[in-house]
């Protein structure tokens, strides 16, 4: 799934001409990959991407009322996902498994579920998009390695690991 998402995101980016890597490539890719991991339908990816942008803006603003309103939007979003999966088996995907999780004999309520998914989604999307940006910057500044990796694609996994070890997304 990740490879197909990467290919389609690259193909879309190639149609743009000039490209702002983070907003027009890394962030959309991260949202798509995270949505696939969570088992969320592709139809809600644009909505999630818009929500993430509003969430980042609200956080930067320091306005607690705005931040709270954006958090409520995510709860409504999660509630729709939960309703759509109400009768799904717990092993359908990771989101459904979480929705069937019981703590002290009771299921997670909407607020708890939204909190876990919000922290997970925002954190993972940030890490994935930062990693993509770091890797693209590294490739742009190391044309010799671009060529070497084109000629020897088997080197990609260790090269990616090494670049992200040197310049990690969480630093």
Task: Give the predicted meaning of each segment.
Residues 1-171:
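Cytochrome P450
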